[in-house]
Design a protein with these regions (language model features):
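The canonical Cys-X-X-Cys-His
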Residues: 55, 61-70, 120, 187, ...
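Charged, low-complexity, helix/coiled-coil-prone segments
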Residues: 1-11, 61-71, 93-105
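Sequence context of c-type cytochrome heme-c attachment sites
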Residues: 32-43, 50-53, 69, 85-91, ...
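Electrostatic cytochrome c docking/interface patches
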Residues: 36-60, 72-79, 104, 174-177, ...
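A generic secondary-structure signal for well-formed alpha-helical elements
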Residues: 30-37, 62-66, 71, 75, ...
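Post-cleavage N-terminal segment of exported redox proteins
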Residues: 1-48, 162-167, 188-202
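Electron-transfer interface patches adjacent to heme c in soluble/periplasmic c-type cytochromes
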Residues: 13-22, 80-184
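Surface-exposed patches in mature extracellular/periplasmic domains of secreted proteins
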Residues: 67, 133-138, 198-202
């Protein structure tokens, strides 16, 4: 087939492009759905507790994913700084996943347990009190806002529909688990669990 025919016939060119992309998708993407390594949770992965789940929602609400990624790429510079590279099995229960694509701030995929709860609270309340050159905004209202847990059980039921193994007991006790806690408690609980399902050697 001569290139001139393709160049003059946009419809034919578009059809062949769609065909090429479809074949590429079928051969590269579809097999991933059938590999256990991409859709099975890593050993030791536990569902978020009610408080951690609320913290995750606050993380999303406050736009943290706009400045922090949660995916360490398998490059030496990243693994030396952040720890073990991210694997798909860590994120199978994250709906939506929060890998992110921008790093105004550091990657948080392995931040769990790296700093104390008190450090995290101080940093979220006013980052410049802890890191003077920080560009991160302060979140003082997280200390004042209380959780009532009104929708926590419903959130867990929805997540169970996505295949996350929440038990009836988890769901029944969800409201009591978060009631009276602050949004700061919740987001710190969420941050402290990130990346803890994989043995992290730096």
């Amino acid at each position: 087939m001569k290139h001139e025919i393709l160049e003059k016939n946009i419809g034919l060119m578009a059809l062949l492009m769609v065909l090429a992309v479809s074949i590429g998708g079928l051969t590269q993407i579809v097999p991933l759905f059938f590999q256990d390594v991409t859709n099975e949770p890593v050993e030791g992965l536990k569902p978020y507790t009610a408080l951690q789940l609320e913290g995750r929602d606050i993380y999303i609400r406050e736009g943290c994913v706009g400045c922090h990624s949660q995916m360490i790429r398998p490059f030496r510079a990243e693994t030396e700084r952040y720890g073990h590279y991210s694997v798909a099995g860590e994120s199978v229960w994250d709906h939506p996943f929060l890998w992110g694509s921008k790093r105004t701030g550091p990657d948080l995929a392995r931040v769990g347990g790296r700093y104390s709860d008190e450090w995290q609270r101080a940093h979220l309340y006013n980052p410049r009190n802890v890191v003077p050159e920080s560009k991160m905004p302060a979140y003082p209202w997280l200390v004042e806002n209380k959780l009532d847990g009104k929708y926590t059980a419903k959130k867990m039921e929805v997540m169970r529909g996505f295949g996350i193994p929440y038990t009836d007991e988890d769901i029944a006790g969800a409201q009591d688990a978060v009631k009276g806690k602050t949004e700061m408690d919740a987001i710190v609980a969420y941050l402290q669990v990130l990346g803890t399902s994989i043995k992290n050697k730096r």
